[in-house]
Amino acid sequence: MTLRNDWTREEIQALYEQPFLDLVFKAQQVHREHFTANTIQVSTLLSIKTGKCPEDCKYCSQSAHYDSKLEAEKRIAVEKVISEAKAAKDSGSSRFCMGAAWRNPHERDMPYVLEMVREVKALGMETCMTLGMLNQSQAERLKDAGLDYYNHNLDTSRKYYSHIISTRTFDDRLNTLDYVRQAGMKVCSGGIVGLGESREDRIGLLHELATLPIHPESVPINMLVPIEGTPLADVEKLDVIEWIRTIAVARIIMPHSYIRLSAGRESLSDSDQALAFMAGANSLFSGDKLLTTPNAGEGKDQALFNKLGLTAEKPKPTVSDLSVDAMSA
């Protein structure tokens, strides 16, 4: 399938409106054109600083604006992070993602995160961080330290965005993605479904992602996990079939991207997840927790992989890895 960055909303809507089985069949065909069948990229996500975030994202337990009963934690020691990364690698994860509840990293935090990137990279894992907004200098320093991916989700459509967040703009998010690209890192960016948005908004989110100059290498499709104390605690749950439709459309319009199952997966049955894989999802977060929300544990994931005949993808060597190998040869 030809890679395109000029998808129209009307084309994306037409995909959504296909009969479900036709849509999933098409998505699986596209998936097999560009990826190895029955192989899933596995990532582990660790919170390196939890809670007291100044942003007001209405879905988030870490926001200081809401009483979610979350116990805030200061930055954890680099040694603890490395220990967790080693355990993740031993459990089959090829990528280790580190997240901090910041609006943006302060300069005093940069030596801390840069050391962390270098140490995790030395383990032979792909590295990813989500630290909030970045400026160009910070993006370049993260790249120089060995960061492979930077996550910064768009969350929802531009139209619906102001219903969810007021403390940073949609364009703030796009600017950070631009800095990440300019620095030479790979982009991880997706969104959350089930925020009370309409299908039109889900179309809008995918349209924004699929018309970026370069598609994100990873596209997380989160399902809202309602958290007591947040404004979205009682929002009506999105139908799983609609979530899978979103995954299938994302696969078709961004054929080279990894489509990741992220938050909300712990509430899904094995059959739901199998359908999501059939619809083109080929990445997931493993482990008992995603930052502050529960997640399917590693044991459950391995049991599911065994049941479905899936295997975990091995880390891909980066340009810097190949350069080191050449120097040592």
Swiss-Prot record:
State how the cofactor is bound: Binds 1 [4Fe-4S] cluster. The cluster is coordinated with 3 cysteines and an exchangeable S-adenosyl-L-methionine.
- Alphabetically list the UniProt keywords: 2Fe-2S, 4Fe-4S, Biotin biosynthesis, Iron, Iron-sulfur, Metal-binding, S-adenosyl-L-methionine, Transferase
Which catalysed reactions does the entry list for this protein?
A: (4R,5S)-dethiobiotin + (sulfur carrier)-SH + 2 reduced [2Fe-2S]-[ferredoxin] + 2 S-adenosyl-L-methionine = (sulfur carrier)-H + biotin + 2 5'-deoxyadenosine + 2 L-methionine + 2 oxidized [2Fe-2S]-[ferredoxin]
Q: What is its EC number?
A: 2.8.1.6
Binding residue positions for [4Fe-4S] cluster: C53, C57, C60
Signal peptide residue numbers:
none
Q: What GO MF annotations does this protein's record show?
A: 2 iron, 2 sulfur cluster binding; 4 iron, 4 sulfur cluster binding; biotin synthase activity; iron ion binding
Pathway(s) it belongs to: Cofactor biosynthesis; biotin biosynthesis; biotin from 7,8-diaminononanoate: step 2/2
Describe the location of the Radical SAM core domain by residue ranges.
Answer: 38-262
Please list the cofactors this protein needs.
[4Fe-4S] cluster; [2Fe-2S] cluster
Q: Which InterPro entries match?
A: Aldolase_TIM, BATS_dom, Biotin_synth/BioAB, Biotin_synthase, Elp3/MiaA/NifB-like_rSAM, rSAM
- List the CDD domains hit by this protein, alphabetically: Radical_SAM
What residues does [2Fe-2S] cluster bind to? Answer: C97, C128, C188, R260
Q: Name one GO biological process term.
A: biotin biosynthetic process
Q: Which PANTHER family match?
A: BIOTIN SYNTHASE, BIOTIN SYNTHASE, MITOCHONDRIAL
Fill in the subunit field for this protein: Homodimer.
HAMAP family assigned? BioB
The record's function comment reads: Catalyzes the conversion of dethiobiotin (DTB) to biotin by the insertion of a sulfur atom into dethiobiotin via a radical-based mechanism.
Regarding protein family, the annotation reads: Belongs to the radical SAM superfamily. Biotin synthase family.
Under NCBIfam families, the record lists: bioB
What's the protein called, per UniProt?
Biotin synthase
Please tell me the species this chain comes from.
Acinetobacter baumannii (strain SDF)
